């Protein structure tokens, strides 16, 4: 169910932006040709733009809008010493709040696979994409 939901949203976004759709189609055709016209695991791993499209889809339409985590140790909230997350306390992490933060992802409503390119990922904290 989660895979089909992600693929449905990816296809929806690609239908809205035919230039992205064409770029992905060209990558798929070129990569399959490079792998002797065989669609294998290695072939799929070579589709870097495909990974970006799927990652951006998951960023814009997260399957889990919130993540529940348990604090491993006491944590004093920076700048607020009276607020302490006690060890063992359950914490809700708002996935969609992080993914839609314009400080991290400019124009968060825009579908832009380039924001998840290898170069862009190196400039961002690894916890900014859940």
Predicted feature descriptions by range:
Residues 14-19, 28, 32-35, 61, ...:
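A generic secondary-structure signal for well-formed alpha-helical elements
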Residues 2-19, 23-27:
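Cytochrome P450 catalytic-core helices
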Residues 81, 118-130:
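Cytochrome P450 heme-thiolate "Cys pocket" and heme-binding signature region
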Residues 9, 35-38:
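Long, K/E/R/D-enriched contiguous segments that form extended
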Residues 61, 93-123:
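Conserved cytochrome P450 K-helix/beta-meander segment immediately N-terminal to the heme-binding cysteine loop
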Residues 8, 25, 29, 55-62:
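Amphipathic, well-packed alpha-helical segments that form the structural scaffold of globular domains
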């Amino acid at each position: 169910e989660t895979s089909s939901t992600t693929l449905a949203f990816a296809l929806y976004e690609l239908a809205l932006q035919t230039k992205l759709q064409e770029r992905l189609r060209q990558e798929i055709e070129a990569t399959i040709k490079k792998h002797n016209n065989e669609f294998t695991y290695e072939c799929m791993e070579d589709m870097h733009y495909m990974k970006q499209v799927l990652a951006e889809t998951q960023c814009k339409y997260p399957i889990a809008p919130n993540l529940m985590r348990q604090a491993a140790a006491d944590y004093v909230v920076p700048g607020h010493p009276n607020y302490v997350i006690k060890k063992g306390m359950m914490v809700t992490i708002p996935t969609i709040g992080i993914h839609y933060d314009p400080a991290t992802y400019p124009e968060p409503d825009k579908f832009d696979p380039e924001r998840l390119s290898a170069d862009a990922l190196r400039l961002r904290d690894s916890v900014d994409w859940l």
